[in-house]
Amino acid sequence: MIVEYLDTLSPVGKLIPSVGRERAEVKTWEALADGLLDASLLARLEATWAGRSDAERSQAWIDRQLGKVHAALRAMSQGLADKSYCVGIHLSLADIAVGCALGYLDFRFPQIDWRSLYPNLTKLHEKLMQRASFADTVPA
């Protein structure tokens, strides 16, 4: 909601198309990235929750969530195909959402080797990392 409000304040450089098919596509990509983040966060919480003993942790739950992460990565890779951006020919909220999701995987799940599995996502992520807005906000 915040990004949608902020997007209305600028007459140029819209991150979300105002109407039509492209708007639906951007929102679909955003939902896909959000789903990846939801599943990865659930897996992370289950694996690291301080209030639980190892016996109380559910590896099956973690595996289920990571399966969702991998399914989302496959869907993103298929949707991106050989395009430069997720939707259209310019940066949109779709690209930002995907870039943030991939960055979170790098930060919390370095064992997920999405770069070698999905070179087109790697290419998009590298392009996004050339932007100061991405490069300056990488977690330390």
Where are these regions (language model features)?
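Short helix-capping/linker segments at secondary-structure and domain boundaries
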Residues: 48-52, 105-114
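C-terminal end-helix/capping segment
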Residues: 116-137
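Non-transmembrane alpha-helical segments in soluble domains
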Residues: 3, 7, 27-30, 73, ...
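Generic structural signal for secondary-structure transition and capping sites
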Residues: 11, 38, 78-85, 110, ...
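GST-like domain detector, emphasizing the conserved glutathione-binding G-site
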Residues: 1-63
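GST superfamily/GST-like fold recognition
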Residues: 86-110, 128
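Short, hydrophobic secondary-structure boundary micro-motifs
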Residues: 13-18, 85-89, 114-115, 135-139
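Amphipathic alpha-helical packing segments from all-alpha helical-bundle domains
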Residues: 61-80
